[in-house]
């Protein structure tokens, strides 16, 4: 016998309450509670992911199955997934509206259709609209099926009929299950539809991609458990006024996290950027003050990026500090060290810092480049265009070691840099390539004296 239970659920964070609340005690959102009646079947349970019947087995007796990853024609996309698409995996892709999530998945789908059957389910566009959008992407294989539907029961039926190898859901907020009360995109609908898709993906070995909307704070909309249910969480990000897009993995059960893939939006769709370091530095001005280059690591990939700074006397009572692509607290810490340990009077100076090209820099190794960029703008002295900077800055002004120092130096040498300032205690036992000088430093003051003297 079915039991009905009425619950009020916050549509912003998924907090549940037995009664209506004007303000959510969890996320402080106003007027976000919606009543949802969930019908629970007492006797029947969800089918096990292993099949109709599942029994405990010893770990040593489990067959060691080596999954064959399916490669797309985009090496950047394969890199983020950990080497390709794993059969039966559930992949969630989020991003701002208009950033190119549907375009990315449509391109990936056309490539996967050459290696298996693809079912593309859209709840936001008709089949004719998707066909019109796909014409600029090139030829499409016959094993590419379009299905404009929002009913989960109908989608399940077509999955059982077509038996696809790859399934794309665009988007999860538009799909609804008739067994669950609540409107499309509600917390209960998103949770139950995702659970059903997970069961279909695991039992039928279907690699499933799910598009998810994001909130105004930039996080994935819907219940937080959505990210826990899936195997991989990808964020597709970038400035809407820039052509570059970054695909970032924040969770991956089948590969490394913090890997990124870089794409450029063009008239024919997304084009992968195979040498992002050269792209990010090609517009750098020689002789400009307030600029420094750092070799940052994005997963296993070294990328050269430019840190820009503009330091100018303030006209306000309190100096302004603005950052784009850099952590505000990290910049404030570095400016305090420069003022205390290096004698730079920055308390009456406005400071504006950004990472050129729209890439986000958040690892400790960027500290030294940020400090040099600030000092360059403050002193009105440019850095050499062939110099790069590596190192974390401590509160006493010391330069601390960073990871993968040899890989970073090799990347700088590959792009023609002739000098790299790096932590002295991190240079022992590494092979330095020819044509580049590595200067071991111990304090920020030592670096500023060497660069600007």
Swiss-Prot record:
UniProt-recorded Gene Ontology molecular function terms: ATP binding; ATP hydrolysis activity; ATP-dependent DNA damage sensor activity; damaged DNA binding; zinc ion binding
Enzyme class: hydrolase
Enzyme Commission number(s) of this protein: 3.6.4.-
Motif (RadA KNRFG motif): 251-255
InterPro entries with a match to the protein in the record: AAA+_ATPase, DNA_repair_RadA, P-loop_NTPase, RecA_ATP-bd, Ribosomal_Su5_D2-typ_SF, Ribsml_uS5_D2-typ_fold_subgr, Rubredoxin_2
Assigned keywords, A-Z: ATP-binding, DNA damage, DNA repair, DNA-binding, Hydrolase, Metal-binding, Nucleotide-binding, Stress response, Zinc, Zinc-finger
Pfam families given in the database record: AAA_25, ChlI, Zn_ribbon_LapB
Ranges for region Lon-protease-like: 350-453
Residues reported in the UniProt entry to bind ATP: 95-102
A GO biological-process term: recombinational repair
The keyword Ubl conjugation belongs to this UniProt entry's keyword annotation: no
GO cellular component: cytosol
Span of zinc fingers (C4-type): 10-27
Disulphide connectivity of cysteines: none
Free-text function comment from the UniProt entry: DNA-dependent ATPase involved in processing of recombination intermediates, plays a role in repairing DNA breaks. Stimulates the branch migration of RecA-mediated strand transfer reactions, allowing the 3' invading strand to extend heteroduplex DNA faster. Binds ssDNA in the presence of ADP but not other nucleotides, has ATPase activity that is stimulated by ssDNA and various branched DNA structures, but inhibited by SSB. Does not have RecA's homology-searching function.
Entry similarity comment: Belongs to the RecA family. RadA subfamily.
Domain comment (free text): Has a putative N-terminal zinc-finger, a middle region with homology to RecA with ATPase motifs including the RadA KNRFG motif, while the C-terminus is homologous to Lon protease.
Matching HAMAP family: RadA_bact
Name the record gives this protein: DNA repair protein RadA
Gene: radA
């Amino acid at each position: 016998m079915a039991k009905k239970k009425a619950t009020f659920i916050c549509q912003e964070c998924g907090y549940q309450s037995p009664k209506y609340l004007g303000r959510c005690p969890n996320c402080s959102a106003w007027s976000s509670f919606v009543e949802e009646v969930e019908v629970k079947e007492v006797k029947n349970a969800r089918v096990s992911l292993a099949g109709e019947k599942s029994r405990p087995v010893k770990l040593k007796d489990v067959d060691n199955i080596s999954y064959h990853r399916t490669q797309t024609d985009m090496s950047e996309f394969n890199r983020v997934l950990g080497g390709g698409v794993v059969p039966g995996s559930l992949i969630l892709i989020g991003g701002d509206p208009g950033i190119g999530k549907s375009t990315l998945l449509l391109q990936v789908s056309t490539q996967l259709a050459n290696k298996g059957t693809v079912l593309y389910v859209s709840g936001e566009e008709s089949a004719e609209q998707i066909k019109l959008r796909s014409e600029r992407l090139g030829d499409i294989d016959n094993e590419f099926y379009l299905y404009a539907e929002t009913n989960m029961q109908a989608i399940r039926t077509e999955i059982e009929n077509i038996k696809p190898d790859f399934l794309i859901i665009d988007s999860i907020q538009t799909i609804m299950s008739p067994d669950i009360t609540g409107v499309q995109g509600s917390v209960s609908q998103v949770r139950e539809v995702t659970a059903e898709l997970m069961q279909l993906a695991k039992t039928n070995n279907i690699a499933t991609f799910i598009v998810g909307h994001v909130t105004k704070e930039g996080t994935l909309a819907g219940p937080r458990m959505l990210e826990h249910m899936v195997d991989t969480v990808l964020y597709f990000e970038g400035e809407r006024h820039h052509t570059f897009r970054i695909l970032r993995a924040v969770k991956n059960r089948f590969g490394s996290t913090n890997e990124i893939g870089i794409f450029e939006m063009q008239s024919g769709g997304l084009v992968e950027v195979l040498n992002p370091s050269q792209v990010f530095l090609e517009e750098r001005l020689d002789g400009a003050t307030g600029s420094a280059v750092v070799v940052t690591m994005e997963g296993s990939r070294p990328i050269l990026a430019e840190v820009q700074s503009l330091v100018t006397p303030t006209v306000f009572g309190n100096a302004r500090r603005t950052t784009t692509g850099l952590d505000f607290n990290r910049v404030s810490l570095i400016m305090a060290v420069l003022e205390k340990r290096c004698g730079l009077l920055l308390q009456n100076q406005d400071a504006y810092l950004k990472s050129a090209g729209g890439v986000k820099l958040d690892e400790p190794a960027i500290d030294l480049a940020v400090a040099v960029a600030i000092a360059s703008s403050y002193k009105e002295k440019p850095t050499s265009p062939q110099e790069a900077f590596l190192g974390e800055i401590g509160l006493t002004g010391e330069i601390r070691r960073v990871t993968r120092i040899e890989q970073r130096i090799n990347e700088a040498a590959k792009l023609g840099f002739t000098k790299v300032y790096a932590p002295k205690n991190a240079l022992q036992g590494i092979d330095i390539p020819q044509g580049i000088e590595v200067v071991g430093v111990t304090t920020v003051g030592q670096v500023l004296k060497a660069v600007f003297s």
